[in-house]
Amino acid sequence: MFEFEPDRIYLTESGYRQLEAELKRLQTVERARIADEFRAYKEHGEFSSEDTELESLKSELAYVEARILELRNVLQNAVIVREADIPTDRVGVGSVVTIEEVDTGTQKQFRIVGAMEADPEHQKLSYQAPVARALIGHRKGDVVEVTLPKGTVRYRIVNIEK
């Protein structure tokens, strides 16, 4: 078990592996592909200041290099939440939480994950999201208030699991 510190970067083990795979792909496959395109362009084209294809390649390379730096930084500084460290007695990073909106009875279930692995369409909510921030540290049965753009909403924690 670890003590949650909101200013740290957290990743689940699977999120860490996904970012590692993305970093490896960018460093090998994407860099090589862009380099090949530069070589092919150099062999067949004349460079000019208005060359949109060349500018597009430069922009793509800049994006790839910036993403590589970002991923390296995140992977070096992240706190990895191991499966064994995911709490079930209180909400934490890695927890699968079922909540119920007190006023409507509507239930939602999601996993609280690191910001870099958040994917709301697949029920993966960043620990930095307002709902997740409000839930972290609370226990099953607790009612928490969350201030959202639509107003204050009260949620009851129905279940917490790994």
PLM regions: where:
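N-terminal intrinsically disordered, low-complexity, charge/repeat-rich segments that act as generic
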Residues: 1-77
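Short, charged, intrinsically disordered terminal tails
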Residues: 2-4, 158-162
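Non-DNA-binding regulatory cores of transcription-related proteins
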Residues: 81-155, 161
